[in-house]
Amino acid sequence: MAKKFNEYYLNWDEINQIIAAAKNLKESLVLKILARTGMRRFELSKLEAKDVDFERKRLFIKKGKGATEKDPKSRAVPIDDDTLQTIKFYLGSRKTGFLVQSNKKSHDGISLSQINRIVSNCAKRANVKNPNPKLKNMNPHIFRHSFSRLSLAAGIPFNMVQRIAGHADARTTLQMYGVPSITDTQQLYDEKLVDKFQEKSKNKSNAKLTDFTGKSE
């Protein structure tokens, strides 16, 4: 059975390898925000310097998916100390304008195509391939799927992942990530059950596989 697109994701080692491949502060910042908040690339492109709350360690997203003038789909998301430090270094003394600026015009925000290139180029430098075999290059959305999958695997409740990811309905989070991947299932199966099988087998029977050689029933 073919995997659904949201079942393909990176592990933390792969994510950190891609981040480590950044050539400058801008690339590092883009990768860290995508990987550590699950933010959509559109949302990242619209972030402003004033949307960073350094004291409370939060980013304020004013224009989420489906935002309108009457319903801006705003939300706050937590951010880690390392990413905040990267933001401080990148901004320097600047306190206004877009958080991540365009390569072409300093007063414009980073474009979606620039975000795509940063993710793709850093993944190539790190020699980390897109886990989806149908896609040649790494793309920003794989970071979003990875964040949600890894957060749930770490024990973060569904409603919290929903809030951070900006899903309007918890059912979206449940439908997309509610079923653990076969990789996670296999790992837990091996960690939690296999030893029990062997332990019970030793206690209940001394039979060896060689005892059944040649017997089909």
Label every PLM stretch briefly.
Residues 21, 33-34, 150-151, 163-164, ...:
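Short alpha-helical segment immediately N-terminal to, or the first helix within
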Residues 34-56:
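Short, charged phosphate-coordinating catalytic segments
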Residues 67-88, 97-121:
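C-terminal catalytic core of Y-nucleophile DNA break-rejoin enzymes
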Residues 52-54, 156-176:
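Short, polar N-cap/turn motifs at the start of nucleic acid-interacting alpha helices
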Residues 8, 12-41:
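Basic, Lys/Arg- and aromatic-enriched nucleic-acid-binding interface segment
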Residues 117-163:
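Short, basic (Lys/Arg/His-rich) helix/loop patches that form interaction surfaces
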Residues 2, 9, 191-217:
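C-terminal secondary-structure termini that scaffold catalytic or DNA-interacting sites
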Residues 1-16, 103-106:
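Flexible interdomain linker/hinge and immediately adjacent N-terminus
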